[in-house]
Amino acid sequence: LLPGDTPSVSDRRRLIKVTAHELAHIWFGDYVTMRWWDDLWLNETFADWLGDKIAEQVYPDLGVAASELGAVDRVMTSDARPSAVAIRLVDAAPEAALQTVGVAYNKGKAVLAMVEGWMGAEAYQRGVLDYVARHAWGNAAGDDLWSALARAADLPVADTLRSFIEQPGLPLVVAEPLGGNRIRLTQRRYATAGVEVAAERWRIPVRLRAGGAGKVVERALLLDRESTELALEGLDSIDWLLPNAGPSGYYRWRLPARELEQLAAVAPDHLSAFERYNLLANAAALLASGDLGADGYLALLGRIAVDPDPAVLDGVLDRLETIRTPLAREGRVAGWPEFLRTTLRPPLERIGRAPRPGESAQA
């Protein structure tokens, strides 16, 4: 099915993902079928979620999970537009429901992954198996899925999923240290600078990681109000804070400038490659929304450009253009070529210009 004798990694990955996705429709589409067109997202979202898990387990060298980081970031960018639509349009006509299929793939999959992380993998799997067993060779709606997941975990899954599935856009979670081990979390709708969007409220499964005095703790919570304060038990003080550990959540996040610098400084030791990628992607989103200045973004870009992980470096290259417009506004484009040479020469010299024997497919 692939042209030539040496297909590219991206072509191989695309073929495997599509094949696994279509096989997953045996369960989500054939074995259990949507009741009406407004739940078309159930078929496509679940098939993509399960298909990616299959592809990652069978072909770990193709970097399926790493490639999804970029896909989720791109759908977040689209979801920030005023024209964004909800994944599920209740009682929609077939023509209207079909318009949401595009966002259903990546946003829907990211939301399901967030809920899976919140519930725990075992509880989530029990809920999905319950859903499939109850509606085998029959029809089901979104409410049936939410009820099955809620039974498996005794959590407010229905209201949480509705807040992401039945309204457009995505939240921005602002994390502010208050001194000692206390922080404040506030949510609002994320939007790019100068764009007016309707206010929305979400029920957000948030996973935090923080470090202080040589100790590291994680805390999971549901942010179901505009703002809340909490203490990170196990720490006396906070040296650094990661507002989206995993990254597990479908949300943008913001730290004060000083705390963002502290997080970037400890990223090589305390953040996974996926979390470092998210740190960069999130910074680009903050640049677009006006929540991060050009200097702060350039400093972060320079730090992450020395990252050893190929997926993170690929993210750096993808986001080099995001800074050109802010620099042009400030009349600083003349220094851009030198920044590129200084930033990209070390990783280029380390990686080389040609594949090395035994090098992974992703590299």
Regions from the PLM with identified roles:
Residues W49, W118, F164:
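Conserved catalytic core of Hanks-type protein kinase domains
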Residues P3-P7, M34, P94-V101, V132-A133, ...:
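Short beta-alpha connecting loops at secondary-structure transitions
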Residues R12-R14, E44-A110, M114, L260:
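Acidic/His/Gly-enriched intrinsically disordered linker/tail segments
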Residues L2-P3, T33-W37, W49, P94-A96, ...:
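Flexible loop/turn segments at secondary-structure boundaries
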Residues A24, L62, T77, I87-V90, ...:
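Non-catalytic accessory/interaction domains
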Residues P3-L69, V128-L129:
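Zinc-dependent metallopeptidase catalytic helix centered on the HExxH motif
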Residues L1, D30-V32, D91-A93, K109, ...:
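Short, histidine-centered active-site or binding-site loop motifs used for metal coordination
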